[in-house]
């Protein structure tokens, strides 16, 4: 099964999840430092990213892994507070600049394309102290940070992601409070953070477009997470509509303003307005974009970056009591099929990725698509011979093959999560997504390839999948 040239060849990491060195060389604290140091069992065994994979001092080891696999692309994120300790350009930490310069230069020397994420969940604590994503002031601060990165690294970086999974961060960090910064403003916080993130992304895109694109000739987008929503009963109109609301609230909430017309989906606006009225709010809990803002937001992405891990069945669940919450606004319930295998929240549903790719193609005018994350975890302790996990990848590649060759989806890059076992947010080190095993007990943090790494390298080398014997 042959793939288009260089389709499979990427692996990502994220700064807080791998770097460690949380207070090394002038790095300022980020919200995940604060969140994990506060304890309270919000993270598995109160684990932290203080050391993680040690990539801040062990970059050379990561580079060996990248070369061993023959990667074409390496996606990494910049620790905002390592570059700018208080989040602003008032003070620049040169040692942080040097670290990322070395990564970029080493990748290019070895023929690997850097894909750089500006912000992957790790907001500088100094900015959170001023309101974080709930404050409109963050929009200009993010734009200045983005411009600093474009001017510092953009002569060598052609592919940028502004914000990683804003939809996850808004719900988990500012609505439910399960993620850092742990703000629990149910029914309001997530929407407010999202409103500011969309505008911040758009501002950064325009800055690139007007100040850097002509010379640097790069591309800018953002990465959106999506759980594919499958109607529980495909013959039930109620469930079909519930699945439509599910993808509208989760995915189109960000994608439609940015890729289509600068505004939220009509279904989302009407659902939240109707619930807000029932709850006695004087106006909708979802802010409105001005006409000027809609023009500013529309069309601010140069490719479509999506992250898929799993699927859920969706059923209609009427919000009779007018309860607050995103799922309650959407009037949906999510659940898994008991027959789906998997670890933790990742149920293995390879066909979901093909459905999602087709949805993007049909809804967003057949864009160039990058899958910037997709993966399967093992429980700790993991098996180095992870043949069963590789089978999940193999089935996924078969679905990608069909999406490309049968459905004519314009997929141009696939990145498996992740290069290394790492700090998996609330799961700490208990879930292992890496293609390389990391021994977190050993101070040297040795990296050892799983069977999956060797198989992934074969796909890169052969530009396709060998059929199972």
Swiss-Prot record:
It is an enzyme of class 3 (hydrolase). Inhibited by 2,4-dinitrophenyl-2-fluoro-2-deoxy-beta-D-glucopyranoside. The active site is at residues 165, 373. It catalyses: Hydrolysis of terminal, non-reducing beta-D-glucosyl residues with release of beta-D-glucose; a beta-D-glucosyl-(1<->1')-N-acylsphing-4-enine + H2O = an N-acylsphing-4-enine + D-glucose; a beta-D-galactosyl-(1<->1')-N-acylsphing-4-enine + H2O = an N-acylsphing-4-enine + D-galactose; beta-D-glucosyl-(1<->1)-sphing-4-enine + H2O = sphing-4-enine + D-glucose. Coiled coil: none annotated. Disulfide bonds: none annotated. It is found in: Cytoplasm, Cytosol. Substrate binds at residues 17, 120, 164, 309, 417, 424-425. Neutral cytosolic beta-glycosidase with a broad substrate specificity that could play a role in the catabolism of glycosylceramides. Has a significant glucosylceramidase activity in vitro. However, that activity is relatively low and its significance in vivo is not clear. Hydrolyzes galactosylceramide/GalCer, glucosylsphingosine/GlcSph and galactosylsphingosine/GalSph. However, the in vivo relevance of these activities is unclear. This is Cytosolic beta-glucosidase. It comes from Cavia porcellus (Guinea pig).
């Amino acid at each position: 099964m042959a793939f288009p040239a260089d389709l499979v060849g990427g692996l990502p990491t994220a700064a807080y999840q791998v770097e460690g060195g949380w207070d090394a060389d002038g790095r300022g604290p980020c919200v995940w430092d604060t969140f994990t140091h506060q304890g309270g069992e919000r993270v598995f065994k109160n684990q932290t990213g203080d050391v993680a994979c040690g990539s801040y001092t062990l970059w050379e080891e990561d580079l060996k892994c990248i070369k061993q696999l023959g990667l074409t692309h390496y996606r990494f994120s910049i620790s905002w507070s390592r570059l700018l300790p208080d989040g602003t350009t008032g003070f620049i930490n040169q040692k942080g600049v040097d670290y990322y310069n070395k990564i970029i230069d080493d990748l290019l020397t070895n023929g690997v394309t850097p894909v750089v994420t500006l912000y992957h969940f790790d907001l500088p604590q100094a900015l959170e102290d001023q309101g974080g994503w709930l404050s409109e002031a963050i929009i200009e601060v993010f734009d200045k940070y983005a411009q600093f990165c474009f001017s510092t690294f953009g002569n060598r970086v052609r592919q940028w992601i502004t914000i990683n999974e804003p939809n996850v961060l808004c719900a988990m960090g500012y609505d439910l409070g399960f993620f850092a910064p742990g703000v629990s403003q149910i029914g309001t916080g997530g929407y407010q953070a999202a409103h500011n993130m969309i505008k911040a992304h758009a501002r950064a895109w325009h800055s690139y477009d007007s100040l850097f694109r002509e010379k640097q000739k790069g591309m800018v987008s953002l990465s959106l997470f999506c759980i594919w929503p499958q109607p529980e009963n495909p013959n039930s109109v109620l469930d079909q509509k519930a699945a439509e609301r599910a993808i509208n609230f989760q995915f189109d909430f960000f994608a439609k303003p940015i890729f289509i017309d600068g505004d939220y989906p009509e279904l989302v606006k009407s659902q939240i307005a109707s619930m807000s009225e029932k709850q006695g709010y004087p106006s909708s809990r979802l802010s409105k974009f001005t006409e000027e803002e809609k023009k500013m937001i529309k069309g601010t992405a140069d490719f479509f970056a999506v992250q898929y891990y799993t699927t859920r069945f969706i059923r209609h669940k009427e919000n009779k009591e007018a309860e607050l919450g995103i799922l309650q606004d959407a009037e949906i319930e999510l659940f898994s099929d008991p027959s789906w295998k998997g670890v933790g929240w990742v149920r293995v549903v390879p066909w979901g990725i093909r459905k999602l790719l087709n949805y993007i193609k049909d809804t967003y005018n057949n864009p160039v698509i990058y899958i910037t994350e997709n993966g399967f975890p093992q429980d700790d302790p993991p098996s180095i011979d992870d043949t069963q996990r590789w089978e999940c990848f193999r089935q996924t590649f078969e679905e990608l093959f069909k999406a490309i060759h049968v459905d004519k989806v314009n997929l141009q890059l696939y990145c498996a999560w992740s290069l290394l076992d790492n700090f998996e947010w609330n799961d700490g080190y208990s879930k292992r997504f890496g293609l390389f095993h990391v021994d977190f007990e050993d101070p040297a943090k040795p990296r050892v390839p799983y069977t999956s790494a060797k198989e992934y390298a074969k796909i890169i080398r052969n530009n396709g999948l060998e059929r199972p014997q």
